[in-house]
Each structure stands twice: as C-alpha cells, then as structure tokens.
A protein has these predicted regions:
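Single conserved hydrophobic/aromatic residue that forms the stacking wall/gate
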Residues: 1-11
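A conserved active-site cap/scaffold subdomain adjacent to cofactor or substrate pockets
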Residues: 12-59, 66
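A glycine-rich phosphate-binding loop feature that marks nucleotide/adenosyl-phosphate handling sites
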Residues: 33, 67-73, 162-166
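Conserved, charged catalytic cores of large soluble enzymes
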Residues: 28, 50-89, 109, 113-128
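Basic, alpha-helical terminal appendages of large translation-related enzymes
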Residues: 27, 91, 96, 106, ...
Length: 203
C-alpha cells in the first residue's frame, strides 16, 4: 500500500485491512479501495446512522431514551437477528474468519439504515408510542453494532457509546442478544462526527 499522503497506520486502516485481507492470505489492496471502504462503511453507514438517530431523538424524544414503547414485528425482526446469529459470530471469531465478521457488521449497518428510512419516524409524530419504539429500536441497533465493532475500531466505538453513557466495561458480546439493554429515560448525549470522509486526490 503506497498512500498518496504519508501518514501513520491508524484504526481506519486496520478496519480496511481486516475486511479486505483474509487471515494468513495475501490481499489486493489500494489507496482508492481504502478510501471507498472507509467512506462507505464507516462515514456513511455507521457514522451517519449514529448522527441521524441521535439528532432525531434529541429533537423528538426530549433528548432521552424513550420509555413508552411497544415492539412490532419489523422491530423484533431486526433486533432478534443479532442474538440469532450470536453463536455463528462467535465461531467465526474463534476460527479467525474476520472477513465474515466485518461483512456481517456491514450488512447489519445497511439493514439498520434501511429500517430507519422505511419506518419513517418523522411521519409518526401523531403516534408517539410508534415514534418512540422506532427510535428505541434504532438506538439499540446502534448499541449492538457498536459492541460488534469494538474489537476492530475501539477508540471510535467508545466515542459512539458516549451517546448512551456507556464505556469499555459495559461491552460484552453476549449482550447483543438483549433487545432492551439501554436504560429507558436516560439522557442521550451529542457526539462529534465519528468519521470524516476521506477526500480523494485528483493527481
């Protein structure tokens, strides 16, 4: 890898290398692929999801984790996938199949963004229970995905978990199976942008 800009190896680069190179094998990597990967997976999918949901929750849920919720089928379908896949995830980690691990996280991020878009909580302001439930579900998904991302990008995940006043000691893989881990009524904190897009060089 010969970067256009000289810089030290950082956490974002590690994420890219783990995604692109199978353990023990060679990989085809490039600066362009790195930039596309970071911009797509981390800046657009993970970082943008966090910012969108937080901003909506602060504006429409008094800046708190919603208390009155009632899960519907769409909510449980996406929430339960994490617990349903827990043993498979553990197995892939134990066998150092980190490509699968990253792919699972990326697919989960796509599903999370699709869930929030499809549910359209901004159109549910006359149904506060439904609005609250969508927001709570989205926050739980962010929490679950953050727990999964922690071994790969720990520093960035700890920044994201400040949303919920959670820290390193709160992160346990088995807790991705819990659908009501977050404490209802607790305050939600604003966070800085997690990942700035990498601007491509034109030279």
């Amino acid at each position: 890898l010969r970067p256009r800009r000289q810089r030290q190896m950082c956490i974002r680069d590690r994420y890219y290398l783990i995604k692109e190179v199978s353990f023990g094998n060679d990989g085809n990597i490039s600066q362009d692929k790195l930039e596309d990967c970071i911009n797509s997976d981390l800046a657009n999918n993970y970082g943008n999801l966090c910012q969108r949901v937080i901003a909506f929750a602060i504006k429409n849920c008094d800046g708190k984790i919603p208390e009155k919720i009632k899960f519907e089928e769409d909510d449980l379908n996406i929430l339960n996938k994490f617990g349903d896949n827990l043993e498979n995830i553990r197995s892939k980690i134990d066998h150092q199949n980190l490509n699968f691990y990253i792919d699972y996280i990326v697919n989960s991020l796509f599903e999370a963004n699709k869930y929030f878009n499809d549910q359209e909580p901004w159109k549910k302001k006359d149904d506060i229970i439904r609005l609250n439930t969508i927001v709570f579900t989205a926050l739980e998904i962010i929490r679950k995905i953050s727990f999964l991302l922690y071994p790969i990008i720990p520093g960035s995940v700890l920044k994201a978990l400040k949303i919920f006043n959670l820290g390193e000691n709160d992160i346990k893989l088995e807790d991705i199976s819990k659908n009501e881990f977050l404490i209802k009524g607790n305050s939600i904190n604003k966070i800085d942008i997690l990942f700035k897009k990498i601007e491509k060089d034109n030279d």
